[in-house]
């Protein structure tokens, strides 16, 4: 039986740059760095973002960008503060996609290795309620 999400791993060219991104945007806390010891495929670091285990490993960046992404929940009151954090790190912030009212707001950005991240103010419950409301209006 699946118990939950174990971890996420991102392959990055520059471990130190990604460390600055994780700490600067997500308030990640570094809990392990392989440094010169290598027990895995390559040098790696582990972080906690809240209770989520995030691993980064040194390697080649993604060849191209896509809409595949990881979304982290943020409070709407913190939206502007997070947008400022992303901007200060010089990350490629993308325009938000069109949404209907009630679905929350999002900050989309790419890291230097073509991974897309989203900082989102909404929840699944809110999204489903909004979609149900839209279906009712259409009937």
UniProtKB/Swiss-Prot annotation:
Active site: 44
InterPro entries named in the record: Fosfomycin_Res_Enzymes, FosX, Glyas_Bleomycin-R_OHBP_Dase, Glyas_Fos-R_dOase_dom, VOC
SUPFAM superfamilies for this protein: Glyoxalase/Bleomycin resistance protein/Dihydroxybiphenyl dioxygenase
Quaternary structure, from the entry: Homodimer.
Family matches, as NCBIfam families: FosX
Function: Catalyzes the hydration of fosfomycin.
Protein name in UniProt: Fosfomycin resistance protein FosX
Species, as recorded: Mesorhizobium japonicum (strain LMG 29417 / CECT 9101 / MAFF 303099)
Higher taxonomy: Bacteria, Pseudomonadati, Pseudomonadota, Alphaproteobacteria, Hyphomicrobiales
């Amino acid at each position: 039986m699946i118990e939950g999400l174990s971890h996420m791993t991102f392959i990055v060219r520059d471990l130190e740059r990604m460390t600055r991104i994780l700490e600067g945007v997500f308030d990640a806390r570094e809990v392990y760095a392989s440094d010169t010891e290598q027990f895995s495929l390559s040098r790696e670091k582990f972080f906690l973002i809240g209770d989520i285990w995030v691993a980064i490993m040194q390697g080649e960046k993604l060849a191209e960008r896509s809409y595949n992404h990881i979304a982290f929940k943020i409070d709407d009151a913190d939206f502007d503060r997070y947008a400022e954090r992303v901007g200060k790190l010089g990350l490629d912030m993308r325009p938000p996609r069109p949404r209907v009212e009630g679905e929350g707001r999002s900050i989309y950005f790419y890291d230097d290795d073509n991974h897309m991240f989203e900082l989102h103010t909404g929840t699944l419950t809110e999204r489903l309620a909004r979609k149900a409301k839209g279906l009712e209006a259409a009937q």
